Amino acid sequence: MASKIPVIEIFGPTIQGEGMVIGKKTMFVRTAGCDYACSWCDSAFTWNGEERDRIALMTADEIFRKLKETAGENFSHVTISGGNPLLLKGLGELIELLKQHHIRTAVETQGSRWQDWLTDVDDITISPKPPSSGMRTNFDRLDLMVGKLTHSGSRLCLKVVVFDEKDFDYAKTIHKRFPLVSFYLQVGNPDIISPDRDQLSSMLIQKYQWLIDLTLNAEEMNDAYVLPQLHTLVWGNKRKV
């Protein structure tokens, strides 16, 4: 029997706004459920219950049909987001189906859970959460996950969202722990509800400049990439972009 995957929204095509695939044209499949509760989460609706009535239990075939209904042939890449998609064993069926249709996939996770299907994903971002999130990193699990993916030859990067200098120090720790893995710093968005796109963009550019300055003055970050949250600069806090 086909697995049922809890999906809260499917949208696109749009532009990937984060990490090593920033700027990539992609579709999004956003799953429900997370094992974290980050204080600044911009998709808390996937786990806090406020949109539980919108969750649809869908098979891989149903998700694929919805992607095609939404975008036709106007995509070749699908980002599976959350929540934490790594809670869902059944996503392996979707990954395999997309691969059969020559569609590349991307997944982002905090590195707290493992599923064997992850090695079949084309673009993998592990984003351990810094102190400002209120969460604690299980480094044993993170070490195991990075080790498995590195051994499998997966295309992998690490990304840390930075809100303050404590987060930046945490990012140094992560980068030092995994020096051979591509490493990305991303400025955090402290205002996830403002409807004023221009004001938000101005504030985020200032934060981005601040993060660039920190990085340029930190020899521990000589190999780091510093990125904005691109979709927020372009569209503000708008959903489904």
Regions found by a protein language model. Name each.
Residues 8-9, 15, 25, 37-122:
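Conserved Radical SAM active-site core
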Residues 75, 86-241:
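Conserved AdoMet/S-adenosylmethionine-binding subsite of the radical SAM
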Residues 6, 28-30, 42, 79, ...:
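Conserved beta-strand segments that form the floor/walls of ligand-binding pockets within enzyme
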